[in-house]
Amino acid sequence: MKKNRVWAVFYPIFVYYLISAFVFFALNILLGETQEIYMLKQAVSSGATIPVLFALWKQDNEVERVVYGKEKRPLGQYVVQAVLACTAAGTFGVALNNFIAMTPLVQVSEGFQTANENFFGGGVWMQVLASCVVVPVAEELLFRGIVLKRVALFAGETIGSIYSALLFGLIHVNLVQFIYAALLGALLAVIVVKTKRVSLAVLGHATANLIAIFRTASGVLDFSYQPTLAGIGFSVVMVAIGMVAMLALVHTLQKTGTGKLAS
């Protein structure tokens, strides 16, 4: 039984890696390995995994709906929750980036430097397509839609959230991105556990990435990377705004209640 549980959690990750690695390898052969098209290859290879991940997520979701029923919630409530989830993820992402940049980790991590060069090697619109549309859908379906849910079935939502966050961090390989992805993943897991909507994690993930792209392209928040009073103060304010947004999100749920993990 335990082996079956482990397999149920990890085989979607293996499938994700096999498909994305195969497509990325094929694109390397066809298009070459220049930084200018790295995000294009990332978008295509991640996009190739979405049909399979969606099918697995939908299968789990249908079983759950048969057991617990389908809960209908008004569109207005969803819009409010989406705004709050995006605010929480966006501000928390800004603060995380700032606090990590204030440490020596960014300078000493060669893996992060390489990943950063690849990420920002192409045009802004390709960065937006890959990291704000395709990748958030694929990664949230996998980690918050499938892994979290499957672990939660036998270990509870707290353990499911921790596992999904840690595994999400591990796929980013280098230490800097592991810390950022694991902590942001934990927040996204809380959003899914509280709201029962994976789509809100997708929106939050996309928002955090979009802000990262915007601030890098514009340089508008460069001061907040520095361990100065202004940089630290701004980052603390971002955390505070994120916490208020999360509390407001929970408050909207207390009015209506929610069911089991759903869409």
Place the predicted regions along the sequence by residue.
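Interfacial transmembrane-helix boundary/kink motif in multi-pass membrane proteins
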Residues: 1-18, 62-95, 153, 229-236, ...
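Alpha-helical transmembrane segments in multi-pass membrane proteins
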Residues: 12-62
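Functionally important transmembrane alpha-helices
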Residues: 17, 21-26, 165, 177-230
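Hydrophobic core of alpha-helical transmembrane segments in multi-pass integral membrane proteins
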Residues: 17-25, 48-55, 86-95, 233-254
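Juxtamembrane helix-loop-helix connectors linking adjacent transmembrane helices
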Residues: 32-38, 66-135, 153, 222, ...
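Membrane-interface helix/loop boundary segments of multi-pass membrane proteins
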Residues: 138-163, 190-197
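Small-polar-interrupted transmembrane alpha-helices in polytopic inner-membrane proteins
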Residues: 157-172, 206
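C-terminal membrane module of polytopic membrane proteins
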Residues: 206-263
